[in-house]
Structure formats: structure tokens, C-alpha cells
């Protein structure tokens, strides 16, 4: 009998030891997995693939022990930064709150949280966080402007203007539609940039998590009403991302933005040109603005006389 009792106790101890070993291995594997996710996320983030980076940081955050507050804070911050870049404001606000809850040391988390809340119309909490940030960084212009906006927005809502802004149902799809540009002798064509599911590009953007954009066009019918947009004919659109176009004064040249793909390098935006012939647009050709190959050039706009080309860029010498 004593032998049986001792045998059972021994088995219990062995079982407990096995469970403890398995628990330690699980924690170790989870920690290793989290580090792998962070490294992958950092690689995606470095080339501007914010959506793909967010997926890795989210996994890393969930695999990090709650008691490991510094790492939880850092991974929540990285996740929030991804969401901020792609305008996922609700998710960004939640991630910044997690970073602050685990005492992330950079006060910018408080500022960015306030901005994300303001974009959602949560003026009360945004105001509170702007004021908290201003206590840490007195006189900061972004926080000062944000605070003022939160104070003014409720008053503006009580005193609406004489103008009514509404969505145009024919021109908008289920995804983003933006950068409209009128075209034609009678301005009866409207070119838009769209990410709707029907576009030609089959690739899901690692930046946004949706399809890469193409340029579509809508035309007015005999009654002067806009028709459903369709993809631009010719060789304008490709497997890459095209959008944000404008036209030369004579209507013969289109200036557009294109972002090509490279798994190893950031997606640098470049300006291309396309010429119109027989009611269709040619395959775009890159417009060399500078020998700088490490900067982006996008969102072109041509002056009325056709002599000046305005664009946005992150090239050295700017203020952004």
C-alpha cells in the first residue's frame, strides 16, 4: 500500500514537472515568435508597407506577456504608428491608449492619440489629451491648433453654413474615390482615382490593405448627368498603382502619379505622362524631374499656361 502511495505521488510530481516544462516552452516559443513578428514588422515598416507591418506588430503584441510592460508599450506604439499612417483612426487611438497604459516614454503618443480622437469627432477626449500634452510640451503649435479646433468644432456644428455637402452616389464606389479632375472642351468628363474592387490591378496593397488604385472616368449623358465611372481605355492603367492625374491646357497630355512595387525597397511615387490619341491614352512614360532616386514625386498640377508643374515631394529642402 505504501508503495502504491509513493508511486502515485511520484507520478503526480512527474506530471507537474512535465506541465511546468511545457508551460516554460510555451512562454519561450511565444516570446521567440513575438520577436520574429517584430522583425518582420520592422522590415515592412521600413519600406512603407504599413498594413502588412501592422499585422506583424499585432501578433507580436498579443504574444507579449502582460507583465512585460516595456515591450507591450513599444509594440503597441509601433502598431499605432502603422494605423496612423493609413488613417485607421479608431484602431490608432486604441493602440496609442495601450502604449500609454504601459507607460510608453515618448509624449508624442499623447499628441497622436488626441489627433486620432479629433479625426473621429471625439472632441471631448481629444481636448483632454491635447491639454495633457501641452503640459508636457508647452506652446507646441500642433497641439495648440488641435485644442483650438476641438473648442471650435462643436460651435461650428451648431451654426451650419448655407452650403450642403453630400456624397455623389453615381461617382462613388464601396472603396476610396478621390482626386477628381475635369476634362474636355465642355468639362463633360471627370477622371477619378479609385480603389474599388473592379479595378484591373489584382494586388492587395501592403500599404493600405486594399487594391492598388487605378484611374477611371465618368462622362455626362445627354441630360447632363454623370454616368457610372469606367476604367480609362488604352494603356494607362497597369498592375501598378496609378492616380492623382491632371491635364495640360491643350488636353493632349495627362500627368499622373504611379507607384511601382519592389519587395526590397520603399514604394517611391513618380510622375508619369500619357498622351491622348484617338480618344485613348498611351502607356505612361516616366517624367524625370530630378536625378534624386530616393525621393517621391506625386500629385502633379499644371499651371493654366502650361509652363509650371507643381507637385508634392519629400526631397531634401522641404518643410515636411
Predicted features along the sequence, with ranges:
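Alpha-solenoid helical repeat scaffolds
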Residues: 38-39, 70-78, 108-112, 128, ...
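Short, conserved micro-motifs composed of acidic
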Residues: 47, 85, 112, 119-320
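Canonical positions in the second alpha-helix
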Residues: 60, 98-99, 132-133
